[in-house]
């Protein structure tokens, strides 16, 4: 398994007077089993780049390959990509939405088509991995501290058992 970016560029507002180039001819290979860090100033394109890795946004030009397949090919399954390339956003409170923590963490596995029992098992295991106490499982995620929200967001991605885990600004906040 690997992720390859081949001459990827991204322009927000392409073909408008307000066009802004966020990525310019980026080529990168992330082999299986590797840890990498992206460092750059605010506005340098780090978040834009990681959103390309699981197909949340489409490159203006260039190609992105996962396991040797171009993720923008018509027959490529984005749902499968998103189950294998998990993304925890910079602000975890933006990806929490269910009425309670446990339901929030179950959402991803259920969306993959797993049974309720399997989704719940994965959610329980993921919440344990991130060290969230059992007494918080049925509280609203919006009543948690910032650090607890971050743990819930990470657990939600871990419950999908991705092959690749992307953390956007993991130490922010």
Language-model features, listed with the residues they occupy:
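The feature captures the beta-strand-to-loop junction immediately N-terminal to the Walker
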Residues: 39-41
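Helix-to-loop junction immediately C-terminal to a conserved catalytic motif
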Residues: 54
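Conserved ABC transporter NBD signature motif
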Residues: 62-73, 81
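Conserved ABC ATPase "signature" region
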Residues: 117-135
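Conserved ABC ATPase signature
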Residues: 140-144, 148
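Conserved catalytic motifs of ABC-family nucleotide-binding domains
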Residues: 161
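Catalytic Walker B motif of ABC-type/P-loop ATPase nucleotide-binding domains
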Residues: 165-168
């Amino acid at each position: 398994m690997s992720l390859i970016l081949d001459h990827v560029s991204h322009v927000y507002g392409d073909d408008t007077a307000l066009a802004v180039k966020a990525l310019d001819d980026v080529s990168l290979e992330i082999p299986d089993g590797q840890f990498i860090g992206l460092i750059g100033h605010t506005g340098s394109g780090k978040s834009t780049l990681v959103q390309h890795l699981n197909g949340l946004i489409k490159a203006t030009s260039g190609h992105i390959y996962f396991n040797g397949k171009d993720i923008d090919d018509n027959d490529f399954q984005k749902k499968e990509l998103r189950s294998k390339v998990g993304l925890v956003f910079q602000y975890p409170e933006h990806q929490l939405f269910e009425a309670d923590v446990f339901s929030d963490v179950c959402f991803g596995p259920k969306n993959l088509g797993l049974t309720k029992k399997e989704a719940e098992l994965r959610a329980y295991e993921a919440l344990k991995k991130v060290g969230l106490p059992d007494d918080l499982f049925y509280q609203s995620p919006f009543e948690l501290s910032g650090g607890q929200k971050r743990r819930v967001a990470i657990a939600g991605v871990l419950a999908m058992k991705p092959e690749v885990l992307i953390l956007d600004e993991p130490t922010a906040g």
